[in-house]
């Protein structure tokens, strides 16, 4: 009788324990489901010692998920894994799937693979978890192997998983063959074909590969298109410079009674500048944003300001700026960049001072725009002010700003300041070296430019097209013909293609210093068609050195064919004929100009008397 009572007590105790474990498990699942991960972990730590083996196994998936999403220290995740092994719960497929997801969150790809490989039984979730981990780590070909294995064992992936693979394929810049393989997976599964998410991912992928035909085919086949689908098409077309199509799609989207969102508007705006519609298209999109209540968005307002400036309507951009309730550093940067593009350095400095008064600190983007304005204005007084502001804001370690300062000082006439900035840079990239070479070249210091060029190569930097052009320009300014010839003939050593701009600079150098025959030979042997600039510089060299022979006539003929509507070419040709005594030919050139209604462009000068900028054209009269 006593043994019967004892048995009943054991059964009751186990039933009570099982009920408590069930209640705890349900409570933990509820907390994790509602994303209260911190509370779930606290409850687990409080109750862990009262749990039996069965109860522990039941709550493990919830606790592991909470650990992963709460981003607890990795040590807790490792402890949970050890407890799984100790309790024999690692044989449970659900627990193993949770461990894979947790290790993926902690970016422990080797642990992910180990758990997956040691699983006795795998399901769809197992494969989805490890493939998502591969997508997260950029392991495209590993993911492809797993997706093949998944199909081999009869597991069908969800559309979200294939969408992740497509996004990875796009990000990794894979071949179109791989892209079409994933597309084939979609075509063989009707459920996937109905997925808007998956179709949108396909559209985005094909547009990133610049395959418009395939993208439009997928887009047209979609039975349901949402805002994201249309936005993917619009942004892809604009990114691939198919601006007209991007704008047409934007209008078609509205005809389908779909409301473009903030991302759609930001995607279509760059097309406005490229299509040369002026500010009319920007106004159309701006009006749409007002009608649908998007106009208050700060990032969108900043984008509208930038586009108005690029379309030449700075005044309207300023109205937007002044009427904005909240003006953050992005808006200030947009407004300053707008004035910088128009070359209004005075207004740029006024805005900078106003910005400081309102207590807003300039960031690197703002300062780069200001440096750009000063570079274009070539005003040294403003350049020094900007440099002080950069020092004050603590951005001198910013390599982009340092490079911009070198260029700014060089163009503003202070080589010593450019040199000082260059040697104070804690880190120098290829642009830094190229900027300094260019600075020496602008001031006619060819030997110093060559020393910097040699130092750049000795420092392990590869010569790119920008550095190559900088050293050729420096030799051109300093008259170092032999050195330039040596460098140009060694272009193949730098594993860099010689561009049209490089040829133009080199031919100009040869022509300026009387090597007309060499210049002409280089021109006719170029691997690409010579530009009008090359023919023009050659013709000027012929005039300077009195070489109006057969070569001079050929060059003049090529120049006229290359740029028949450029009045400067006719003026140069008329001048050459006059100086050679061929007045009849000079008069004929002037008559052709009159018939074509081509007028000579006036020269333009800018001076800075007493810190006031004054502009003069060739036909203007100056009191100075």
Curated annotation (Swiss-Prot):
Pfam families according to UniProt: E_motif (PF20431), PPR (PF01535), PPR_1 (PF12854), PPR_2 (PF13041)
What are the protein's GO molecular function terms?
RNA binding
Q: Where is this region: Type E motif?
A: 534-610
Q: Where in the cell is it found?
A: Mitochondrion
InterPro entries linked = E_motif, Pentatricopeptide_rpt, PPR_At4g14850-like_plant, TPR-like_helical_dom_sf
Organelle targeting sequence: 1-15
GO cellular component terms, A-Z: mitochondrion
Q: Which Gene3D superfamilies match?
A: Tetratricopeptide repeat domain
What gene, per UniProt, encodes this protein?
PCMP-E7
NCBIfam families to which the protein is assigned, alphabetical: PPR (TIGR00756)
Sorted alphabetically, which keywords does the UniProt record give?
Mitochondrion, Repeat, Transit peptide
Protein's UniProt name: Pentatricopeptide repeat-containing protein At4g31070, mitochondrial
Query: Which PROSITE patterns does its entry note?
Result: PPR
Start-end of each PPR repeat: 56-91, 92-122, 123-157, 158-192, 195-225, 226-260, 261-296, 297-327, 328-362, 363-397, 398-428, 429-463, 464-498, 499-529
Q: Which GO terms describe its biological process?
A: RNA modification
Family, as annotated = Belongs to the PPR family. PCMP-E subfamily.
């Amino acid at each position: 009788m006593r043994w019967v009572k004892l048995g009943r007590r054991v059964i009751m105790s186990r039933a009570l324990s099982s009920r408590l474990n069930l209640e705890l498990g349900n409570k933990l699942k509820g907390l994790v489901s509602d994303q209260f991960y911190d509370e779930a972990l606290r409850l687990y730590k409080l109750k862990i010692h009262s749990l039996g083996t069965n109860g522990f196994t039941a709550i493990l998936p919830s606790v592991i998920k909470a650990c992963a999403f709460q981003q607890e220290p990795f040590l807790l995740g490792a402890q949970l894994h050890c407890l799984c092994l100790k309790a024999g719960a690692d044989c449970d497929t659900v627990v193993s799937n949770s461990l894979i997801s947790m290790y993926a969150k902690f970016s422990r790809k080797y642990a992910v693979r180990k758990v997956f490989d040691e699983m006795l039984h795998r399901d769809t979730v197992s494969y989805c978890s490890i493939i998502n981990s591969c997508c997260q780590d950029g392991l495209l070909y590993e993911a492809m192997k797993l997706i093949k294995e998944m199909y081999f064992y009869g597991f069908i992936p969800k559309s979200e998983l294939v969408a992740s693979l497509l996004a990875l394929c796009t990000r990794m810049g894979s071949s179109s063959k791989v892209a079409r393989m994933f597309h084939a997976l979609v075509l063989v599964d009707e459920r996937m074909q109905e997925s808007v998410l998956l179709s949108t991912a396909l559209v985005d992928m094909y547009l990133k590969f610049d395959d418009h035909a395939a993208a439009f085919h997928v887009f047209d086949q979609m039975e349901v298109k949402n805002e994201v689908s249309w936005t993917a098409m619009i942004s892809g077309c604009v990114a691939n410079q198919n601006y007209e199509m991007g704008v047409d799609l934007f209008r078609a989207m509205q005809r389908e009674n779909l409301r473009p969102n903030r991302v759609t508007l930001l995607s279509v705006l760059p097309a406005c500048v490229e299509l040369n519609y002026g500010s009319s298209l920007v106004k159309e999109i701006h009006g749409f944003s007002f009608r649908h209540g998007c106009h208050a968005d700060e990032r969108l307002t900043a984008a509208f300001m930038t586009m108005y400036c690029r379309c030449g309507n700075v005044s309207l951009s300023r109205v937007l700026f002044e009427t904005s309730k909240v003006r953050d550093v992005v808006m200030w940067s947009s407004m300053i960049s707008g004035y910088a593009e128009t070359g209004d350095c005075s207004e740029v400095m006024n805005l900078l001072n106003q910005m400081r008064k309102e207590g807003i600190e300039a960031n690197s983007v703002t300062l780069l725009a200001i440096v750009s304005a000063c570079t274009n204005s070539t005003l040294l007084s403003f350049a020094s002010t900007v440099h002080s502001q950069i020092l004050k804001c603590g951005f001198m370690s910013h390599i982009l700003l340092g490079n911009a300062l070198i260029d700014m000082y060089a163009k503003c006439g202070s080589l010593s300041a450019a040199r000082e900035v260059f040697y104070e840079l804690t880190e120098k990239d290829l642009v830094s070296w190229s900027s300094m070479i260019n600075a020496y070249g602008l001031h006619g210091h060819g030997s110093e430019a060559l020393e910097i060029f040699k130092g750049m190569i000795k420092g392990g930097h590869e010569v790119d097209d920008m550095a190559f052009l900088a050293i050729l320009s420096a030799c051109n300014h300093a008259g170092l013909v032999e050195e330039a010839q040596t460098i140009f003939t060694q272009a193949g050593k730098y594993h860099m293609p010689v561009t049209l701009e490089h040829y133009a600079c080199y031919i100009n150098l040869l022509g300026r210093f009387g090597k007309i025959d060499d210049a002409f030979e280089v021109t006719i042997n170029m691997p690409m068609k010579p530009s009008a600039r090359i023919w023009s510089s050659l013709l000027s060299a012929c005039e300077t050195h009195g070489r109006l022979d057969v070569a001079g006539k050929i060059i003049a003929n090529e120049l006229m064919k290359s740029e028949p509507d450029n009045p400067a070419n006719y003026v140069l040709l008329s001048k050459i004929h006059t100086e050679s005594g061929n007045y009849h030919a000079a008069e004929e050139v002037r008559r052709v100009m009159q018939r074509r209604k081509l007028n000579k462009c006036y020269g333009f000068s800018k001076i800075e008397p007493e810190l006031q900028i004054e502009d003069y054209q060739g036909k203007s009269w100056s009191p100075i």
